[in-house]
Each structure stands twice: as C-alpha cells, then as structure tokens.
C-alpha cells in the first residue's frame, strides 16, 4: 500500500422507525477515544463493500443487515503524514437481531437534526450532512402548489423543493418541514422576513432563518466550481449537466460533499430549466433513491 492508497473503511448508518440514527462512541484505548462515529471498520481485501458491512456490524453491534443502500463515500486524511481514508457509508434501514455493544463502545440513538451537536469525528461530518438531506430534489414553479404535497407527506420519503419564492401561506412550508422536507428558494430577494440568503459563484440555494440549521447548496457545472463552492462553505452540490466528462464528475465526487445529479432534464450546459419539475438523484457517492 502506497502513502496515497486509501484505507477502505465501511460504515453503517442505522435508522430506526422514528428516523433516529445510531452512533457509537470510540472506547478508551483507541485513537480519538470519546468521539462519536458510525459503526463499521476496515474492509478486507477479498470482501465486497456489502460483505464487509455485514461482517463489521455483526462483530461490533450483533446485527445482521437485511436492507441497506449506499449513502455516501467520503475521503479524509487525519493528518498530512497519514494515509487517506475512504469511508463507504451505507444507510441501513432493516436488520435482524438486537443491537448490543460488542466492542466496548457506548451506543445511542440520535435525532438527525441533533447530529451536528454530537462530537462526531471530522471524517464523518459529510455523512451527517448526507443523513440530514432528503434523497430527492424537485423543482416546482408554483410555490403555492406545495400545499398539494402536504396530504401525502406522511406516506412518502422526505424531499427537498426548489421554488422561485416562498409560498404565500407560511403554514405550507412549516407543515412540510415538520415532515422533514426542505424548501429552497432560487431568489434571495424572495426570502421571508427574518431569513437570510446568499449568492456565491453560481446559483446558491439557501433559506436560512436566523438561528436555524438549514443546509445550503450550490449548483455547479465543473470541478473548479465545486471546489469554489466548498471554499464558500456550502453543504451539498447540485449538478444539472449529466453530460459532464467523467474527469469533471470525478473531481466533484472527490470534494467530500453530498451531491445530486440531474436525471430528468436534457443533457446540456443549462443551469436549471425555466419551467417544469427537475428531479435530482444522488450519484453513488451521494444520497441515492432506493
């Protein structure tokens, strides 16, 4: 293994029926003891990622994975002299057996929105963001039509809605957010009183009420724009051009942020279609739809 060859690690983000996520505290005697992380460990050379996930979770917390899907891949280097680590995190939605601490670690269930307050390892911070983000983004031209989404909110997965302005009835946004949905506006001038929006290079999607933790995203068309977005402090990326060269997508994937790719609009350099819905589906290194 060379100095630049990453150490391949698998991790499992277990989500219970209430939407809480299981985290584990590193025990005394291990590096970074006391910090919290997602259960998992190193993949063996002969294993597939899923096989490694099954083995690690059985060894660490005594469960058998019944249903899981890729959530995000994160590259991290703990120090300039340390080899990089590739964390392949899976969303574990069903399992068999009772969860137990088999490695001397403390375990606890944590609400998704409380994860930023947990003393999570720096390497796992992008996983926290991916867990807070919904699997799908949808472009809606009529903000008031979001009210039609409320009656079915309990029967579908969380989603994020991209609108040109906030709905006139503020209760629409509130009820969607109570379900776990996110609402983003394209025009910062259309934000409600008490909210703040910002535009960096490219189009920036944000609705951040004072004191809230709404995640901010940015539309990017190249690897260079993705790096600039990371420097601007965004939380996720939207990639509208599905015809980007593989090398550009590789740069975007390597930025360490969750990202979404356009699977509905025609290929091309346009930022966002002027009308109609736009669906975003996570790439293998980002949030994915089951």
What are these regions (language model features)?
Residues 1-21:
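Conserved N-terminal beta-strand and adjoining loop/helix that marks the start
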Residues 20-60:
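Conserved Nudix-box catalytic region and its N-terminal flanking loop in Nudix hydrolases
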Residues 35, 99-159, 289-290:
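Nudix hydrolase/Nudix homology domain
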Residues 63-73, 90:
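A short coil-to-beta-strand element that immediately follows conserved catalytic motifs
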Residues 74-99:
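Active-site-adjacent beta-strand/loop module that shapes the phosphate/pyrophosphate-binding cleft
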Residues 145-217, 223-225:
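N-terminal active-site wall of soluble small-molecule enzyme domains
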Residues 184, 190-196, 205, 216, ...:
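Catalytic cores of alpha/beta
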Residues 235-244, 264-290:
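Glycine-rich phosphate-binding active-site loops on the catalytic face of alpha/beta enzymes
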